[in-house]
From Swiss-Prot:
Native organism taxonomy: Bacteria, Bacillati, Bacillota, Bacilli, Bacillales
NCBIfam families: ATP_synt_b (TIGR01144)
Membrane topology of the entry: Single-pass membrane protein
Family of this protein: Belongs to the ATPase B chain family.
Compartment(s) of residence: Cell membrane
Quaternary assembly: F-type ATPases have 2 components, F(1) - the catalytic core - and F(0) - the membrane proton channel. F(1) has five subunits: alpha(3), beta(3), gamma(1), delta(1), epsilon(1). F(0) has three main subunits: a(1), b(2) and c(10-14). The alpha and beta chains form an alternating ring which encloses part of the gamma chain. F(1) is attached to F(0) by a central stalk formed by the gamma and epsilon chains, while a peripheral stalk is formed by the delta and b chains.
Top-rank taxon: Bacteria
Pfam family, one: ATP-synt_B
Keywords, in A-Z order: ATP synthesis, Cell membrane, CF(0), Hydrogen ion transport, Ion transport, Membrane, Transmembrane, Transmembrane helix, Transport
GO cellular component, one term: proton-transporting ATP synthase complex
Name of the gene this protein is made from: atpF
Protein's name according to its UniProt entry: ATP synthase subunit b
Length: 163
């Protein structure tokens, strides 16, 4: 019964299996394989090869892009490092210039204070000399006045004694 079912499935239920049909079917299968190879398999393999090349190209490009990005990142880091160093140098330079200016301003202020002090001393000395001269003049005037009074008194006493 199994044999009959298998034969019926193959389409040969009423007849026996013919050798010519098998050869014809085998020949058609080989032709089908050849046609599939030429028109389907080869183009499919070409597409697969192109896809593989495309993926390899993308992978290579991605790898190159990654390397370039890493290189640019390293360059940026180096530039940032240089910028920080330059900024630090500018800050240090500005600090030293500020210190120099501070010292110059302090020195200038000290010199100005010394000049003002010397001018004040000279002014005090001049006023002292003027006061001394005025005092001498006043003492001389008073001395003359006192002397004239004393002389006048002596003269009047002598005049009185003589009279």
């Amino acid at each position: 019964m199994l044999w009959k079912a298998n034969v019926w499935v193959l389409g040969e239920a009423a007849h026996g299996i013919s050798g010519g049909t098998i050869i014809y079917q085998l020949l058609m299968f080989i032709i089908l394989l050849a046609l599939l190879r030429k028109f389907a398999w080869q183009p499919l393999m070409n597409i697969m090869k192109q896809r593989e090349e495309h993926i390899a190209t993308k992978s290579t490009r991605r790898k190159n892009d990654r390397q370039e990005a890493e290189k640019l990142l390293e360059e940026q880091r180096e530039l940032m490092k240089q910028s920080r160093q330059e900024a630090q140098a500018l800050i240090e330079n500005a600090a030293s210039l500020a210190e120099e200016q501070k010292e110059q301003i302090v020195a200038s202020a000290r010199a100005e204070a010394e000049r003002v002090k010397e001018a004040a001393k000279k002014e005090i000395e001049r006023e002292k000399e003027q006061a001394m001269a005025a005092l001498r003049e006043q003492v001389a005037s008073l001395s003359v006045l006192i002397a004239s009074k004393v002389i006048e008194k002596e003269l009047t006493e002598q005049d009185q004694a003589a009279s």
